[in-house]
């Protein structure tokens, strides 16, 4: 089955402020119903167009992975159009190299070599990476999407608007999407939201001198059912993520998420701070020069909790699949991955390393034709 589809096309007109385009709504419906992923170009601005021009349909598709373009210096291309969508959803999602000005992209045309630029040429590179992760490495589309977005998120606070580059620029090499540096622990969690609270409180993170010397990053992706006739209240299901150290039965969240603490929290703040009703959620602690280790509680366990909330019909979020990518960065640069794997195994986790060469060998052997004489 073909699970990854590239759409290098788009409208010259801007998206509307208060409702999703029919084309984008159809893409969102298809991705909710079927196990597929659309990669959509972020559309281009012409020289004659105004500054700050919004993206065009179908780049307002919430479930799709929307790609804008940057130049070779990771700066937004001069033809970039801007998000966000419905004044809230972060679009584009990511950026990649699409050529610009004198540094155009070299392609093969029917008449030979040609030099081009545009988001239509950036998107296929991301499509290739997504297809590689899903078809060759064997990851789910939720995890694949989360990995690609997570790889674009820097430990340093960005100085370019997310309306132009999304969560960041995806690395050129697929190894840098899957692999980590020696001072990082990266793991993926996937599953389905079977009830109101889907959780695990049994993540053993290595302790050093009764502290956790890490900063953390987590990226959540899922594909909710959407309702175009709801206007700005477009997504039907919210997965509210809580991730951090476990103190008794309570998670001390990395991003201080208080949505479940019975405190007064306006909807605008919940959306802005915790991305409520967004199908992509990123939690990140940026590197600080005076960063300190965190206190370790009890057995040094961390946990996560996903609370499922419905806007319209009970059941829209039932069996909704999700993918979470978690990265822990050691603040002193020490490699603690072996200790982490050992502790996970002792607690009953089945830890499978993602080895690119091994997965490719398995894929190639599975694709071989066998002749029975």
Task: Locate the predicted segments by residue.
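Substrate-binding/access-modulating region of protease and related hydrolase catalytic domains
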Residues: 1-57, 116-117, 121-122
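Acidic, glycine-rich active-site loops and adjacent beta-strand->loop/helix elements
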Residues: 11, 42-46, 70-72, 100, ...
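Exposed low-complexity, polar/acidic, P/S/T/G-rich flexible segments that act as propeptides
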Residues: 213-253, 310-373
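C-terminal subdomain of the subtilisin-like protease fold in secreted/lumenal serine endopeptidases
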Residues: 137-215
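Noncatalytic modules at the cell exterior or secretory-pathway interfaces
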Residues: 213-216, 285-315
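Subtilisin-like serine protease catalytic core
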Residues: 33-35, 61-64, 85-91, 136-147
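Surface-exposed beta-strand/loop patches in noncatalytic accessory domains
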Residues: 229-283
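Extracellular S/T/G-rich loop segment that most often corresponds to the catalytic His/Ser-adjacent loop
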Residues: 53-131
């Amino acid at each position: 089955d073909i699970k990854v589809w590239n759409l290098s096309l788009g409208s010259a007109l801007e998206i509307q402020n208060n409702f999703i385009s029919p084309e984008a709504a159809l893409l969102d419906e298809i991705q909710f119903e079927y196990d597929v992923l659309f990669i959509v170009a972020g559309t281009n601005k012409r020289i004659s167009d105004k500054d700050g021009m919004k993206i065009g349909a179908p780049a307002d598709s919430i479930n799709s992975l929307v790609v804008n373009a940057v130049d070779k210096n990771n700066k937004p291309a001069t033809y970039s159009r801007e998000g966000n969508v419905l004044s809230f959803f972060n679009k584009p999602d990511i950026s990649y190299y699409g050529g610009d000005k004198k540094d155009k992209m070299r392609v093969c045309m029917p008449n030979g070599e040609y030099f081009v630029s545009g988001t239509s040429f950036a998107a296929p590179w991301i499509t290739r990476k997504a297809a590689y992760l899903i078809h060759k490495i064997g990851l789910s589309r939720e995890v694949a999407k989360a990995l690609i977005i997570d790889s674009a998120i820097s430990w340093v606070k960005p100085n370019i608007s997310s309306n132009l580059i999304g969560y960041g620029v995806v690395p050129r090499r697929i190894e840098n999407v899957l692999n980590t540096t020696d001072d990082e622990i990266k793991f993926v969690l996937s599953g389905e939201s079977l009830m109101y609270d889907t959780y695990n409180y049994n993540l053993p993170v290595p302790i050093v001198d009764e502290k956790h010397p890490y900063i953390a990053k987590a990226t959540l992706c899922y594909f909710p059912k959407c309702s175009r006739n709801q206007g700005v209240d477009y997504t039907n299901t919210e997965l509210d993520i809580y991730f951090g150290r476990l103190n008794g039965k309570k998670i001390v969240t990395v991003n201080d998420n208080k949505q479940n603490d019975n405190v007064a929290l306006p909807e605008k703040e919940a959306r802005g701070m915790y991305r409520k009703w967004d199908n992509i959620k990123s939690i990140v602690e940026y590197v600080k020069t005076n960063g300190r280790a965190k206190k370790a509680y009890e057995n040094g366990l961390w946990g996560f909790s996903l609370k499922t909330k419905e806007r319209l019909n009970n059941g829209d979020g039932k069996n909704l699949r999700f993918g979470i990518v978690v990265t822990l960065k050691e603040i002193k640069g020490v490699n603690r991955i072996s200790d982490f794997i050992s502790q996970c195994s002792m607690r009953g986790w089945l830890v499978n390393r993602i080895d690119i060469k091994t997965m490719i060998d398995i894929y190639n052997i599975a694709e071989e034709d066998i002749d029975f004489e």
